[in-house]
Amino acid sequence: MQISFYTDYSAQDFSNKNSTRFPSEPERCPFADCSIPVKLKKHGYYSRFFISKTFYGVIYIRRYICPICGRTISMLPMFCLQRFQYSGIDIINILHEFYESKISLKKLIEELKPDLPAIDRRHINYYRKRIIENRHLIQYGLNLISPEFIFAGTIPENQKWVKTFLDRVHKLHPHAFLVDFSKTTGKSFMASQNMIA
């Protein structure tokens, strides 16, 4: 299980192992079938590759273990998405820019290349497709986070819905959305629907 948390530190700050950058140990096991009120223990780190407009490299993620059930959780800084190398904030901002500016995908990629040299069409198309595939999960999470996210009236077609979703998240602030969505649903908004949280 991965739990997102707010942080004022940058990705660069997580490029070395430092416990002070992570929240303190949870006081209760987060797994529903355990949920024992016992302080979890530090259980080392794991490394993952992370790409953003400001950082490209390895970061370290703190792990904790439940002394009762033996399962681990990882504390994920808010700018990380579970199972994605690219920054969740950058993904939201890139897609928002694509839908808002109405520029071609080719032009958008040209603009992104100085900051994200490895990004290409397939990344952006994959992110667009995944959001559409996750529409029901995303809408469910948004409705739980805040009632004003409930779309009233007829169900808009996918592209219009994606644009509206990205506009609202961009106004709310991507950091807040990423952490709140993860805490509310136990998943990333980009999680594969075949995965169990």
Where are these regions (language model features)?
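Long C-terminal interaction/binding lobes of large macromolecular proteins
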Residues: 1-11, 124, 136-197
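Short, conserved DNA-binding cores of transcription-related domains
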Residues: 1-81
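Generic alpha-helical secondary structure signal
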Residues: 13, 18, 49-50, 102, ...
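Short, positively charged, Gly/Tyr-enriched micro-motifs
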Residues: 70-161
